[in-house]
């Protein structure tokens, strides 16, 4: 065979193996890499660009359908842009749901005239949005958020609490640090330990380390925890209205949640049982003039303020326990 033909065929094979990218997205790709400080090796660059581009086009398709009234929320590119959904689920899946019988049961107030909307941020109960980064510690952020609120309720002082303290020190209670945990076990740790350090004295580093709890830096305590009736949104609503921010878990493993930006989140494939992410309900409300329509739970996430709506998400409310928002709700007793 003619050597030149062999070489031509070989080069054609190499060229066909190189991913074809949308050149119209080049500027956005370079801007995204600069914003999120991504540096790839030669072999990884093409793969990550392909994943990012697929995600970008999915987002654009969704937002086009949103403008046609097919969805109630928008999506946007963010720090998870170069991750497949499977990679995202593996990295961010941090909630380990377990039966834990040491808690009290929330006694629903009878004949309570509940407000149409609640936002504990406006009352000073909620610290700024934090970022768990690559560590599977969502459970710790959910737990500190609830405890911060209850300590404010008791003392009138809002102090940011140490998630790293929980990550490093609550393994005896059954938590697994950056490999996941359970908010109720975090509350149990605080009770058994006799306190929890402040974020300032025990800062977050997003990796598992040895326990460095110092009693003299403790700024919070609890006497155990209370669980809200599983799956009952009305009970959760009463707890949020009368107690304060509540720790909950949800199914957050979908691409639609990975790139959520604004609006009321509703995912048809969301599970009310298979929960993988701990978050904090800080209120509830509705959009529009009619309080019976477009109801939502106001949820604080732990993926930084750049994700979602300044770090928050509105989850569809009274939609059959959507995404399991009321399946595993609890709060510390202070």
Swiss-Prot record:
It catalyses: The recombinant enzyme hydrolyzes proteins (serum albumin, collagen) and synthetic substrates (Z-Phe-Arg-NHMec > Z-Leu-Arg-NHMec > Z-Val-Arg-NHMec). CDD domains: Peptidase_C1A. It is found in: Lysosome. Predominantly expressed in the thymus and testis. Also expressed in corneal epithelium, and to a lesser extent in conjunctival epithelium and skin. Keywords: Disulfide bond, Glycoprotein, Hydrolase, Lysosome, Protease, Signal, Thiol protease, Zymogen. Pfam families: Inhibitor_I29 (PF08246), Peptidase_C1 (PF00112). The keyword Disulfide bond applies. Glycans are attached at residues 221, 292. Residues 18-113 form a propeptide. Cysteine protease. May have an important role in corneal physiology. This is Cathepsin L2. It comes from Homo sapiens (Human).
């Amino acid at each position: 065979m003619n050597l030149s033909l062999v070489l031509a065929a070989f080069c054609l094979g190499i060229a066909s193996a190189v991913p074809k990218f949308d050149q119209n997205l080049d500027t956005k790709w370079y801007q995204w890499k600069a914003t999120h400080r991504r540096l790839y090796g030669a072999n990884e660059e093409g793969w990550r660009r392909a994943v990012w581009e697929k995600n970008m086009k999915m987002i654009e398709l969704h937002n086009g359908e949103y403008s046609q009234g097919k969805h109630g929320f928008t999506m946007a590119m963010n720090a998870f842009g170069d991750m497949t959904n499977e990679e995202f689920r593996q990295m961010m899946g941090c909630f380990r749901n377990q039966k834990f019988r040491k808690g009290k049961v929330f006694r629903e107030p009878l004949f309570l005239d509940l407000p149409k909307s609640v936002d504990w941020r406006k009352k000073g109960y909620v610290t700024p949005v934090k970022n768990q980064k690559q560590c599977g510690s969502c459970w710790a952020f959910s737990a500190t958020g609830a405890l911060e609120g209850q300590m404010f309720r008791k003392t009138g002082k809002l102090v940011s609490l140490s998630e790293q303290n929980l990550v490093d020190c609550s393994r005896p209670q059954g938590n697994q640090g950056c490999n996941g945990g359970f908010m109720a076990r975090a509350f149990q740790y605080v009770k058994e330990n006799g306190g929890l350090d402040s974020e300032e004295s025990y800062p977050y580093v997003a990796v598992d380390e040895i326990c460095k709890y110092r009693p003299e830096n403790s700024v919070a305590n609890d006497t155990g925890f209370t669980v809200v009736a599983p799956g009952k949104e009305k009970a959760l609503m009463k707890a949020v209205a009368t107690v304060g921010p509540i720790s909950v878990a949800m199914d957050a493993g979908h691409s639609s949640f990975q790139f959520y930006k604004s609006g009321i989140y509703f995912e048809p494939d969301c599970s009310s049982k298979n929960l993988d992410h701990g978050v904090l309900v800080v209120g509830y409300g509705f959009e529009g003039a009619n309080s019976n329509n477009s109801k939502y739970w106001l949820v604080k996430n732990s993926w930084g303020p750049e994700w979602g709506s300044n770090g928050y998400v509105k989850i569809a409310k009274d939609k059959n326990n959507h995404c399991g928002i009321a399946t595993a709700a609890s709060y510390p007793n202070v």
